[in-house]
Amino acid sequence: MNTATGFIVLLVXATVIGGIEAGESDMRKDVMGLFRRTICTGADRPCAACCPCCPGTSCQGPESNXISYCRND
């Protein structure tokens, strides 16, 4: 095995081990929750499948124009 192949194997193994450790970490849940809160859809904005409504709001509709909106609960 040459140096480049050894480096690639080491890099892949470190990535796999890091992914396993991150999956078991409580910190990951907090970071993902923070990420979700930053991309949620606020009140009176159109709902989207990729971006859920923020806490305290829910997707309601569709309105007369066939678009659903996040509304305060």
Curated annotation (Swiss-Prot):
This is Lambda-hexatoxin-Hmo1d. Expressed by the venom gland. Pfam families: Toxin_16. The presence of a 'disulfide through disulfide knot' structurally defines this protein as a knottin. Keywords: Calcium-activated potassium channel impairing toxin, Cleavage on pair of basic residues, Disulfide bond, Ion channel impairing toxin, Knottin, Neurotoxin, Potassium channel impairing toxin, Secreted, Signal, Toxin. The record marks R45, P46, C50, C51, Y69 as: Critical for the neurotoxic activity. One of its GO terms (molecular function) is toxin activity. It comes from the Eukaryota. Disulfide bonds join C40-C54, C47-C59, C50-C51, C53-C70.
